[in-house]
């Protein structure tokens, strides 16, 4: 069985989830390969698509005319026209908003042609829906890394609710393009990373009537392991008796990640205690809102060891996101034995309980402060927290679930 994963990149949150799944399948003896637009690893089983595989204009003359037109501010094709409209609005209302049409024609790639089954992942701004689903008739499994495939250009329904009026025409046009393209896909099986994502997919018009299976992200617990608390704190320069919260996000200023609410909740707690409260923040930082007095920004930490040190130094990991497809940082923290305070999004409501943390209401600063206070004042069995998380998200377990699904989808496609 030849499996081809298609993803925008092998890095980032979605890319890391795909990569762990791919490596776990290889470990199970599956012929698994990956096709990406941007390759950041040096793995031989991952291939970057050639930039000249366009839907239109493969010839040198067409490419030259396209380059000249762009310099003159002209749009020769629908992709450029849509791109200009999107960027014009995004300059005023920044958010992730992706086109369902691209300049790639992945249907003609040799890896696509040789695959028995294709597993799509995060493919925004890479997959051209119209050409791909019209030309590719192989069985497809689609792992939902966010909600974009079931929307128009938005990546999360919460953002759509907030900004729809500014993107209304484009959102509706893009959703219609996706819906029409997907009608050509005969053998499509959806994989949701959590029950919440399954509910979204079941309600999306794009996936009406499609089979959906829940398979969580694989997390390599050997990469995320607890450090001795005092050693981690000593390494980071944190007092042994300080109250410490960890927060991780690709972009700290992303309002969907909820750092503003965390900062306000910590300010409440600081007024209630004489003990210092440290907030350890990991991720790109262009945030300019309220900041706790003892807040340290580490930028991006590229190795699991560095992240594990931050998780292990914290008394609690805070996950105040408004929406998540999965929430892998929650699982990473648990794998380090650190209790979690989280909103009930992604995988959190399925795994967070009184033994490993607490849930609180989305956007409720007072409730977040209460939950953090409660966790600070409880004792947790860190080894038990780690063991439960490790067992639930083992890569080999997740790989076996995918293999079983691939076999089922292939058999179903053959019987039709």
Go through the PLM ranges and name each one.
Residues 186, 191, 239-257, 263-266:
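Conserved donor-binding/catalytic core segment of Leloir-type glycosyltransferases
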Residues 339-342:
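Short hydrophobic beta-strand element within catalytic cores of glycosyltransferases
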Residues 309-314:
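Short alpha-helical donor nucleotide-sugar binding micro-motif in glycosyltransferases
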Residues 283-305:
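Nucleotide-activated donor-binding/catalytic signature segment of Leloir-type glycosyltransferases, i.e.
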Residues 322:
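Aromatic "clamp/platform" in nucleotide-sugar-dependent glycosyltransferases that forms part
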Residues 354, 358-365, 373-379:
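Conserved acidic donor-binding segment of nucleotide-sugar-dependent glycosyltransferases
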Residues 380-404, 408:
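A short, well-ordered alpha-helix in the C-terminal region of glycosyltransferases
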Residues 107-108, 134, 148, 160-191, ...:
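Membrane-proximal helix-turn-helix segments that form the acceptor-binding/catalytic region
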């Amino acid at each position: 069985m030849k499996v081809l994963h298609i993803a925008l990149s092998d890095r980032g949150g979605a890319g890391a989830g795909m990569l762990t799944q791919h490596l776990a399948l290889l470990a199970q003896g599956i012929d698994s390969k990956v096709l990406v637009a941007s390759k950041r690893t040096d793995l031989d089983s991952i291939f970057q698509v050639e930039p000249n595989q366009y839907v239109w204009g493969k010839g040198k003359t067409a490419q030259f005319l396209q380059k000249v037109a762009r310099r003159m501010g002209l749009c020769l094709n629908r992709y450029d026209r849509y791109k200009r409209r999107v960027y014009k609005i995004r300059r005023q209302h920044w958010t992730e908003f992706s086109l369902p049409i691209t300049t790639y024609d992945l249907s003609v790639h040799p890896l696509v042609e040789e695959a028995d089954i294709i597993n799509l992942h995060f493919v925004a701004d890479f997959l051209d829906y119209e050409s791909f689903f019209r030309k590719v008739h192989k069985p497809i499994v689609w792992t939902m890394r966010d909600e974009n495939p079931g929307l128009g250009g938005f990546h999360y329904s919460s953002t759509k609710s907030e900004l729809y009026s500014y993107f209304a025409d484009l959102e509706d046009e893009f959703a219609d393009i996706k819906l029409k393209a997907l009608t050509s896909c005969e053998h499509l099986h959806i994989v949701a990373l959590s029950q919440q994502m399954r509910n979204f997919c079941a309600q999306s018009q794009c996936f009406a009537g499609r089979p959906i299976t829940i398979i969580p992200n694989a997390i390599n617990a050997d990469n995320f392991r607890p450090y001795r608390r005092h050693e981690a704190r000593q390494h980071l320069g944190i007092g042994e008796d300080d109250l410490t919260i960890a927060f991780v996000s690709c972009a700290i200023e992303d309002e969907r990640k909820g750092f503003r609410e965390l900062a306000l909740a910590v300010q409440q707690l600081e007024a209630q205690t004489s003990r210092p409260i440290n907030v350890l923040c990991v991720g790109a930082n262009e945030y300019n809102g309220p900041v706790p007095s003892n807040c340290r920004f580490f930028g991006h930490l590229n190795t699991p060891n560095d992240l594990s040190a931050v998780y292990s130094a914290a008394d609690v990991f805070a996950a105040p996101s408004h929406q998540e497809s999965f929430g892998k940082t929650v699982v990473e923290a648990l794998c380090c034995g650190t209790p979690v305070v989280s909103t009930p999004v992604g995988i959190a409501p399925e795994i967070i309980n009184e033994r490993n943390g607490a849930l609180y209401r989305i956007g409720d600063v007072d409730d977040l402060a209460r939950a953090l206070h409660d966790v600070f004042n409880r004792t947790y069995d860190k080894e038990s927290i780690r063991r439960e998380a490790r067992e639930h998200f083992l890569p080999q377990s997740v790989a076996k679930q995918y293999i079983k699904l691939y076999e089922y989808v292939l058999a179903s496609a053959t019987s039709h």
